[in-house]
Amino acid sequence: HTQKSYKLIEFEVKIDQNFVYNKRADGLIISTATGSTAYSLSAGGPILTPLLEAFVITSLNPLSLSARPLIIPSDSKISVEVVENPEDTECFIILDGNEEIPLKGDSRIFYAHKSQSQFKLIHPKEHDFFEACRGKLNWSISQEGK
């Protein structure tokens, strides 16, 4: 730990302007299928196959044992409002571990939605998503010799 005191932040989450929940947690992860095998997975989120067009909303160390990740369609508009943030706790939006945007003053609400820009991931022809998962996540024993 550093000298700063880290405390839980309370979030209010809405999807397409519909209230979903309030949650107290260290943070909130919103990821695509591509990001679902990274930080979201480490926080207990599900793995989405690459062609699934969806968002995963995963709480980071939530106060509630009933907190579960939520999978929603990629055309959804997500709004997250920081309802309660202790004075001595800094709050940031961090994009893909690179860009850090502080939430200060009136900028307590942020929005997430599908971008109109697209990019293609390049894989070798022999790439197999499930084989990669088996290898990286040590899912099962080898099927060789059966």
Per-region residue spans from a language model:
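Membrane-helix boundary elements
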Residues: A33-T34
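Catalytic phosphate-donor-binding core of small-molecule kinases
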Residues: H1-L28, T37-K146
